C-alpha cells in the first residue's frame, strides 16, 4: 500500500487517480500512525515551500517522513514535494527543508545571459535527458513530461540528478538517492512516461526494483 501524505498543499486528486488507473492500493492521510502502515510514501505538493515546511513541522509530518526514510521506507516527492526533500529554499526568504538530499531551491531567473526575458513559471511539456540509471527510470523513454514551477533545485551532488530538462537553465527533473526519489514534473499528468515512472516506483516499494 502507498501512503499519500496530505498536508493541505498537495495535488491529491490527480495522484490518487493515477494510482487507481494502475490499480495500486493507497491511502490519503495526514496521520503519521496511519501512514506508518504504508510500504511506501508519496509527498505531493503545490504552492509555497515556506508554507509547506511550516505545516509539515507543525503537524509532526516532517519528523515522521524523515524517520520513515531512515527506517528504509521509499519516498517519492512530486513537484513542490521534490523540492522539500532538499536542504533549503530561497522562496519567500531562506527556509530549511527536510534535508534528505543535498541542494538548494532557487528561482528560475526569467532572464537569459543576453538580457532577454522568458516566461516564469515554467509551464508545459519539456523533454527528459537521462543522467544516471535508476530503477525509477527503468524502461522509461526520454520523452516529454509536464512541468509547472517557478523554482528549481541546484545541487553539487551530481549523482542525485537522475534526469534533467532544460528551461534556459538545467532543471533537475528526476532525483534520487537511496530510498528517496523526486520528480520536478507531475508524473500523474505526463501520459505514458509519467505512469511508467509511478509503476516503477510501486515496483521499488514491492522490492521488485533495486534501490
Curated annotation (Swiss-Prot):
It is found in: Cytoplasm. It catalyses: 5-[(5-phospho-1-deoxy-D-ribulos-1-ylimino)methylamino]-1-(5-phospho-beta-D-ribosyl)imidazole-4-carboxamide + L-glutamine = D-erythro-1-(imidazol-4-yl)glycerol 3-phosphate + 5-amino-1-(5-phospho-beta-D-ribosyl)imidazole-4-carboxamide + L-glutamate + H(+); L-glutamine + H2O = L-glutamate + NH4(+). One of its GO terms (molecular function) is glutaminase activity. InterPro entries: Class_I_gatase-like, GATASE, Imidazole-glycPsynth_HisH. GO terms for biological process: L-histidine biosynthetic process. Gene3D superfamilies: 3.40.50.880. Keywords: Amino-acid biosynthesis, Cytoplasm, Glutamine amidotransferase, Histidine biosynthesis, Hydrolase, Lyase. Its EC number is 4.3.2.10, 3.5.1.2. Pathway: Amino-acid biosynthesis; L-histidine biosynthesis; L-histidine from 5-phospho-alpha-D-ribose 1-diphosphate: step 5/9. GO terms for cellular component: cytoplasm. It holds the Pfam family GATase. Heterodimer of HisH and HisF. IGPS catalyzes the conversion of PRFAR and glutamine to IGP, AICAR and glutamate. The HisH subunit catalyzes the hydrolysis of glutamine to glutamate and ammonia as part of the synthesis of IGP and AICAR. The resulting ammonia molecule is channeled to the active site of HisF. This is Imidazole glycerol phosphate synthase subunit HisH. It comes from Geobacillus sp. (strain WCH70). The gene is hisH.
Amino acid at each position: 500500500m502507498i501512503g499519500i501524505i496530505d498536508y493541505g498543499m498537495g495535488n491529491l486528486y490527480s495522484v490518487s487517480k493515477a494510482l487507481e488507473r494502475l490499480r495500486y492500493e493507497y491511502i490519503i492521510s495526514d496521520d503519521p500512525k496511519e501512514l506508518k502502515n504504508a510500504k511506501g510514501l508519496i509527498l505531493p505538493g503545490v504552492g509555497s515551500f515556506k508554507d509547506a515546511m511550516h505545516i509539515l513541522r507543525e503537524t509532526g509530518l516532517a519528523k515522521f517522513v524523515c524517520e520513515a526514510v531512515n527506517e528504509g521506507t521509499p519516498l517519492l516527492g512530486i513537484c513542490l514535494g521534490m523540492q522539500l526533500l532538499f536542504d533549503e529554499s530561497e522562496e519567500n526568504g531562506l527556509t530549511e527543508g527536510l534535508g534528505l538530499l543535498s541542494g538548494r531551491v532557487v528561482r528560475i531567473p526569467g532572464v537569459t545571459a543576453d538580457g532577454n526575458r522568458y516566461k516564469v513559471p515554467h509551464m508545459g511539456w519539456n523533454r527528459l535527458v537521462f543522467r544516471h540509471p535508476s530503477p525509477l527510470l527503468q524502461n522509461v523513454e526520454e520523452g516529454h513530461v509536464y512541468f509547472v514551477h517557478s523554482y528549481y533545485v541546484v545541487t553539487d551532488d551530481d549523482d542525485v540528478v537522475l534526469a534533467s530538462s532544460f528551461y534556459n537553465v538545467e532543471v533537475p527533473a528526476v532525483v534520487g538517492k537511496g530510498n528517496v526519489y523526486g520528480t520536478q514534473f507531475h508524473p500523474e499528468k505526463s501520459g505514458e512516461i509519467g505512469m511508467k515512472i509511478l509503476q516503477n516506483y510501486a515496483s521499488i516499494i514491492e522490492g521488485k526494483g533495486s534501490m
